[in-house]
Each structure stands twice: as structure tokens, then as C-alpha cells.
């Protein structure tokens, strides 16, 4: 069992982050926030995909003014992403559930203090978001875009807020590659007790982002590091949630949903297995109950693998077997096998 680092618990709307709270999965809309209809449409898509928290960009006054209606209609806690203009942070803090800022680019201490005071008044948290590509000049000149520079930046920003008597803090340390990201989080973890937001920034398209995020998050989460996370994908929003939840499930940190076991295929296979597995994935993606399903291309491996599965199919030429909890319950023609299998899955999911 993974032993998580003890961190202080904060609240983002109705979602606990840190402490003994489940690791939450979040994403960010890509619409112009001032386009309220499009932004809410994306938030609803994320909600139905299983997201826990959403972040929106606030670039100008119109974006800030749109936040009130978005927050009122959003099914998810809303975090506002603020850069450079502290006045936008003040307006956002009046209505949203949290801010993401870089204290170093907001302006002088008085401006940061104004934002902190606004967040204190509503008891909403601030995420300090450090990115390797946008470090302070003096740190980059001294260390380069290294984990050490990222950690020093985070510690400086944390102290900045602590000196203002503010402690509802989350921290992220993102680079665009796995090694620097993992090293930075590992370096900072023993030094503070604030919850960590995990992410690999600019991770790329679905394929590359999935690989990078699984590698980085897997390494960190197995070490007990991480309280909330975003898989950054250049692509559809729902994929970020799908991949994030799959990472948590495969690490044993989430019990929700279906786990599909399928063979990689070999010379024994006598059916076209990939379309069958894809059909099972599509038909079961809505199931919340934890179920192990096995889709095997021959009888040789199926009997053994099926012992671990709630429901399994062993596909053969012209026919196949359905197995429940290690017991064969039926033999069916190939053309009806998938339908019969899904009927048994539905029974188990109810």
C-alpha cells in the first residue's frame, strides 16, 4: 500500500485537497472565459468526464466579469488563473474557489498582500505555480532551468505568502520533461507540508502527454507525493480526465470504475481481438463500480487470468466462453459472444 506524505488539508470549493483526501483530478478550459456559454459547455464536459476541479484563464476585465455567472452555474469548483494584473486577481477572488498565481509577476508586495487579503476574507486557497520555463531571472542566471532553481523559487514564493500570514497554499513545480519535474517535487517535499499539484507542463499530444504524465506521476505517487493533478494534453479536455483517473486506478489510489485485462495477442489468437476490447471499453466507460474484466484471445490464458476477473471472455474460432469469478457459465457463438458478455457485466455493475 502506498503511504502518502502527510500534508495540510485545504478546501477548493467543496473538494478537499491534501491530508487524507482522495487525490483529485482537474483540467483547464481553453475557451475565452468571457465566452460564458462555451466555457460552461467545456466545464460540463469535464464534469461528466469525472473531473473534480476546473481552472479558467482570466486575461482581462471581461474575463473577470464573466466569473460570477460561470461560478454560479458550474458543477465544479472554479479556480482562476491570474498573471501580471493583480486587479484581476482581486475581482476573481470575490467569486471563485481559488486562485493560481505567480507572486513574482503580480507586482510589489502591496499588490500581493491585496490579493492575499481578498483570499483570506473568503477563505479560498492560492496555488503557487512554478514553471521551469518562466523562472525569475536571477534564479535562471544562477542555476539555469533546473530543479534547484524551481525549488528556490517555490520556497521564496511560499515565504512571501507566509510572511503575510497566509497558509491556504498549494504548490506546483512543472517542467516539460519527466526527470526535472520528478526531481523538483522530490526535492521540495521534505521542506514543506503544503499539498502538491502534480503536472508536466507542455506535455504534448495525447500519446506523448500520456507517457510523460504516467512516468512522472507514477514515480511521484508511488513515493506518496501528490494531492491533486492535471494531465496536460494538446487535445480534447475529456482525455485529460480519462488519463488522470486511469493513472490513479492503476496505482491502486482509486477504486472507481472498470479495470480491463486483455492479452497482447500472439500466434494462438483466432479472432480480431482489438475491436472487441475497444467495444468493451466504450460500453463500460460509464460504470463507477470497481470491476475487473478480462478479454482474452484464446482459452489457454483465459482460465488463469479469469480467476482474477469478475467477468471474462475467452474468444475462440467460431465460439467463446464466458467466465464469472473463475467459473465457466456459458459457451456462445462468436457473433453473440460480446453481447452476452456485456449482459453479464451489466448484472455485476448493478
From Swiss-Prot:
Taxonomy, top ranks, is: Bacteria, Pseudomonadati, Campylobacterota, Epsilonproteobacteria, Nautiliales
- Keyword Lipid biosynthesis present in the record's keywords: the answer is no
The record's family statement is: Belongs to the IspG family.
Q: Top EC class per UniProt?
A: oxidoreductase
Any single GO molecular-function term of the entry would be:
iron ion binding
Cofactor(s) listed in the protein's UniProt record: [4Fe-4S] cluster
Q: Is Metal-binding there in the keyword field?
A: yes
The UniProt catalytic activity note for this protein reads: (2E)-4-hydroxy-3-methylbut-2-enyl diphosphate + oxidized [flavodoxin] + H2O + 2 H(+) = 2-C-methyl-D-erythritol 2,4-cyclic diphosphate + reduced [flavodoxin]
A GO biological-process term: terpenoid biosynthetic process
Q: What is this protein called?
A: 4-hydroxy-3-methylbut-2-en-1-yl diphosphate synthase (flavodoxin)
Amino acid at each position: 500500500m502506498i503511504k502518502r506524505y502527510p500534508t495540510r488539508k485545504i478546501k477548493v470549493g467543496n473538494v478537499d485537497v491534501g491530508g487524507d483526501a482522495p487525490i483529485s483530478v482537474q483540467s483547464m478550459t481553453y475557451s475565452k472565459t468571457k465566452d460564458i456559454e462555451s466555457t460552461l459547455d467545456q466545464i460540463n464536459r469535464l464534469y461528466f468526464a469525472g473531473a473534480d476541479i476546473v481552472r479558467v484563464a482570466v486575461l482581462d476585465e471581461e474575463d473577470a466579469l464573466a466569473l460570477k455567472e460561470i461560478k454560479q452555474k458550474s458543477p465544479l469548483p472554479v479556480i482562476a488563473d491570474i498573471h501580471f494584473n493583480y486587479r484581476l486577481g482581486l475581482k476573481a477572488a470575490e467569486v471563485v474557489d481559488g486562485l493560481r498565481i505567480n507572486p513574482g509577476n503580480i507586482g510589489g508586495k502591496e499588490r500581493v498582500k491585496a490579493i492575499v487579503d481578498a483570499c483570506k476574507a473568503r477563505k479560498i486557497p492560492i496555488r503557487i505555480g512554478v514553471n521551469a520555463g518562466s523562472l525569475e531571472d536571477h534564479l535562471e542566471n544562477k542555476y539555469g532551468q533546473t530543479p534547484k532553481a524551481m525549488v528556490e523559487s517555490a520556497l521564496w514564493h511560499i515565504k512571501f505568502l507566509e510572511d503575510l500570514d497566509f497558509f491556504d497554499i498549494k504548490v506546483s513545480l512543472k517542467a516539460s520533461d519527466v526527470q526535472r519535474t520528478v526531481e523538483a517535487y522530490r526535492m521540495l517535499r521534505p521542506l514543506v507540508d503544503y499539498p502538491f499539484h502534480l503536472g508536466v507542463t507542455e506535455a504534448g499530444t495525447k500519446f506523448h502527454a500520456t507517457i510523460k504524465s504516467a512516468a512522472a506521476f507514477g514515480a511521484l505517487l508511488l513515493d506518496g507525493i501528490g494531492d491533486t493533478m492535471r494531465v496536460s494534453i494538446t487535445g480534447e479536455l475529456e482525455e485529460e480526465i480519462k488519463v488522470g483517473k486511469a493513472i490513479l486506478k492503476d496505482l491502486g489510489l482509486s477504486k472507481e470504475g472498470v479495470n480491463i485485462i486483455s492479452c497482447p495477442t500472439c500466434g494462438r489468437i483466432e479472432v480480431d481481438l482489438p475491436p472487441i476490447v475497444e467495444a468493451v471499453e466504450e460500453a463500460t466507460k460509464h460504470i463507477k463500480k470497481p470491476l475487473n474484466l478480462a478479454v482474452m484471445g484464446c482459452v489457454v490464458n483465459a482460465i488463469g487470468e479469469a480467476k482474477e476477473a469478475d467477468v471474462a471472455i475467452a474468444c475462440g474460432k467460431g465460439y467463446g466462453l464466458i467466465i464469472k469469478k473463475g467459473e465457466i457459465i456459458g459457451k456462445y457463438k462468436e457473433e453473440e459472444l460480446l453481447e452476452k458478455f456485456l449482459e453479464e457485466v451489466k448484472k455485476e455493475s448493478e
